[in-house]
Amino acid sequence: AAMRERRSGETPRGIPINWYYTFNQLPDDSEQPCLVVAQEFLDVFPVHQFVYKDGLWLEKLVDIDHTAESPLHFRMVLSQAPTPASITLMGNAKGHQFREGDGVEVSPVALATCEEIAGKVCKSGGAALLVDYGANATSSDSLRGFKDHETTNILSLPGLVDTTADVDFDACGRVAARRGAKVVGAIPQ
């Protein structure tokens, strides 16, 4: 909360610093470099999970579990038909070789954010360092929940469990490169 209240300041040597909460708040100033440092930022954006079944991409969805045995009262199910998200996000993946049951996770918000960061950085001659969970590949089922620093089922205690998913740094790098950014790539910690 204290960080939200403080919107500007300066270093001990008098260099001004400004904090912003969205990238569109950043000034379009090509005379000053834009430096972005983000830790565990991209992994919190929503993900869509898809499973390849009978030649179609079906989406994993949350459903109500009416069984008496279920302590969570929610369950993950596959859509019965392609969803608008599976058509939009996976429609161009039909030419690839996928096997029955293959899964893919996609975060359109993380990709759009990387594209926006790249645009700002390229325009200003700055740089970005994004430190996060992930790999140089697409995950299929990395969505997980955390509560009190422990891994927990994402469907338990809705609204009280933090969710996270691995970042696809390869996909993020591709969208950044399309905006003109020089991408170094994911480096293991």
Residue ranges of predicted features:
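S-adenosyl-L-methionine
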Residues: A2-Q32
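Class I S-adenosyl-L-methionine
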Residues: Y21-Q189
